[in-house]
Amino acid sequence: MQFIDRAEIEVEGGKGGDGIVAFRREKYVPAGGPAGGNGGKGGSVVLKAEENLQTLLDFRYARRFKADDGKRGGPNNCTGAMGKDTIVEVPCGTVVYDLETEEILGDLVKNGQTLCVAQGGKGGLGNKHFLSNQNRAPEYALPGLEGEHRNLRLELKLLAEVGIIGLPNAGKSTLIASLSAARPKIADYPFTTLVPNLGVVRKPTGDGTVFADIPGLIAGAHEGIGLGHEFLRHIERTRLLLHLVDVTSADPIADYEVIQQELTAYGRGLSDRPQIIALNKVDACDQDTLDLIAEELQQLSQSEIFTISAVTKTGVEELLQAIWHRLDQATSNHQDSSLPLV
């Protein structure tokens, strides 16, 4: 399935039903008063978070959503039926913007959470409301009001607790495939991963934690170079970043610094996010070189450093134990966190 994480849609609430002009016509009431009912309220357009959706792909084909109009009032002071709401399902993690004002209207994080994005119009008043001492038989009523109209931008930010970052070909997809049931495309060339991959990794307790393999970042990603700019926002919600460094690259230290610079340039607190560094592909590196890389990185970062092989799973269990520990710390420090365990 194609991964789409941005879409623009048009939403419109239903028009309110018209009020009507009517009079009482009982057999023994020769001078019956006004009895025109009010129009029904128009339906609203409501976005609803759905955990089984993973992409905004559907909005490439359906971009306009309108709720039903309210019904006109009836005689005998009967109010018209309300218009039916239009419910539009979106993936959990969808941020909703007003396209004209750039105002954030809502952030749909939890399954079943709803957000009304276009209110239905109010129903018009029937002639019964215009009865007065001066006018005992009003011959007019009000039409229903138009529904609210908006153009929206939807942006999906994945709900993952651990974001796996690193340069292209650092082994991110291999790692997430070895840890979970996710089966991303894996090949020995840069930019194999073109979309984020999600995998659920089980703790010894049986609880699951969502890991996100973010497409490889390169220098200038925050300015739109490469693939990173489109996907940096997907790690905004993470509690922990797992930074993979390929020890077989020409300059692993420079690789690490490139990613750190991109996190800082992107902003939104990403450079301050708790981080664990994993030196990957140790099965293809001699011990002396590995020790030298680890020593240099330790001088640049206060993050824990682990040595692993995503292919042979060497060191992976120790890495996972450290991740669980850091997440438990984050949970105890942020009991109000909205990121769900799966």
Curated annotation (Swiss-Prot):
Q: Where in the cell is it found?
A: Cytoplasm
Where in this chain does the record put each OBG-type G domain? 160-328
Its EC top class is hydrolase
Q: Quote the Pfam families the UniProt record gives.
A: GTP1_OBG, MMR_HSR1
A molecular function (GO) term: magnesium ion binding
Q: What is its EC number?
A: 3.6.5.-
Q: Looking at the record's lineage, which domain of life comes first?
A: Bacteria
Task: Name the chain's protein.
Answer: GTPase Obg
Please report the organism this UniProt entry assigns to the protein: Crocosphaera subtropica (strain ATCC 51142 / BH68) (Cyanothece sp. (strain ATCC 51142))
Q: Gene that codes for this?
A: obg
